[in-house]
Design a protein with these regions (language model features):
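Short, flexible active-site loop motifs that bind/organize anionic cofactors or intermediates
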Residues: 8, 49, 72, 79, ...
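The catalytic Tyr-centered alpha-helix of NAD(P)H-dependent dehydrogenases
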Residues: 126, 137-144, 183-190, 222-226
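C-terminal substrate-binding subdomain of Rossmann-fold SDR/epimerase-dehydratase oxidoreductases
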Residues: 193, 199-322
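Short, flexible, glycine-rich and Lys/Arg-enriched loop motifs at helix boundaries
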Residues: 39, 169-190, 200-221
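N-terminal Rossmann-like NAD(P)+-binding domain of SDR-like oxidoreductases, especially those catalyzing
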Residues: 1-174
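Amphipathic alpha-helical recognition patches that constitute DNA-binding helices
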Residues: 12, 139, 167, 185, ...
Length: 322
């Protein structure tokens, strides 16, 4: 049985990755400091090590048990916070990742799937965004992710080290079977905030800008279901274990959904009216961010199963009313 270490495996995306790996009969160990990850997201079938990526000794001790691959999802990810406290993000994201890679090299673990982000691209210069799009992150968070990609690229040239950087677009939804119940704390993303309005936890949603060059005037984004993200991680591990090559791959649906379309979807699924208010544009918000997933299909043999926004919203609502 092939063994995978999932660093950050108690978090929102990480727990779905663990679930997908267990379903494919991998032996899984989760390494998480539970700063944002939650114990309720842990699976009894997976071993758990409570640890921080700053702890080089524990990382190396854990990896010395022998793993075929690492999935690295541990990171600080609040864009605003990264601009206010770049030193925290440099220390945690960049230095912490180097700690992981050094532990891999020192223990002979040769493959890593890295949780990167569409934020490395910055303002789109053309659409849909592909992997050759210019890199120009507009936040320190996005910068840290690209720096980590560059470190991996150099390690792959200098050491016996393979990587797949998966550049996520907007992750949404929850496990369709309801097996993962831990909600993200202090949500920053659109759908969880709309759900807080739907459940009465928040009075209203602010829609930033209705004068964009889009069909309804609100921003368009590419929303990808978290189970589709998880299945791509499994496909990436299998690809590296069989071919021993490195890749950088977008994970997206190639479909744009506007803010108003998301609100309307939640209203259809929940049967509840969403209270929202138009507000001025936020500085730096692009009107449209949509990516092609052609390369993911070609390299990983992967394509998203969730392409209907109502189906995605329903998996989130099912958790709210559980």
């Amino acid at each position: 049985m092939q063994k995978v270490l999932v660093i950050g495996g108690a978090g929102y995306i990480g727990s779905h990755v663990v679930k997908a790996l267990l379903a494919e009969k991998f032996a899984v160990t989760v390494y998480d400091n539970l700063s944002t990850g939650q114990e309720c997201n842990l699976f009894k079938e997976a071993e758990f090590v409570k640890g921080d990526i700053a702890d080089c000794e524990l990382l190396e001790k854990t990896m010395s048990k022998g793993f075929d691959a690492v999935v690295h999802l541990a990171a600080k990810k609040a864009v605003g916070e990264s601009m206010e406290n770049p030193q925290l993000y440099a220390r945690n994201n960049i230095n912490g990742s180097i700690n992981i890679f050094n532990a891999m090299v020192n223990t002979g673990v040769k493959n890593v799937v890295f949780s990167s982000t569409a934020a490395v691209y910055g303002m789109p210069q053309y659409l849909p965004i592909d992997e050759n799009h210019p890199i120009n992150p507009m936040s320190f968070y996005g910068f840290t992710k690209y720096e980590i990609e560059r470190v991996m690229d150099w390690y792959s040239r200098l050491k016996d080290f393979n990587y797949t950087a998966l550049r996520y677009f907007n992750a949404v939804g929850y496990a369709s079977d309801g097996s993962i119940t831990g909600r993200e704390k202090n949500p920053q993303n659109l759908l969880p905030i709309i759900m807080e309005v739907a459940t009465g936890k928040r009075e209203k949603l602010l829609v930033f800008g209705n004068d964009y060059d889009t069909p309804d005037g609100t921003c368009l984004r590419d929303y990808i279901h978290v189970e589709d993200l998880a299945s791509a991680h499994v496909a990436a591990i299998k690809k590296m274990l069989s071919e021993h090559k490195s890749y950088v791959i977008n994970l997206s649906t190639d479909i744009g959904t506007s803010v108003l379309e998301m609100i309307q979807s939640v209203e259809r699924v929940t049967g509840r009216k969403i209270n929202y208010e138009m507000a001025p544009r936020r500085a730096g918000d692009p009107s449209t961010v949509v990516a092609t997933n052609k390369y993911a299909k070609e390299i990983l043999g992967w394509s998203p199963k969730y392409t209907n926004i109502d189906e995605i919203v329903r998996t989130t609502w099912n958790l709210e009313v559980k």
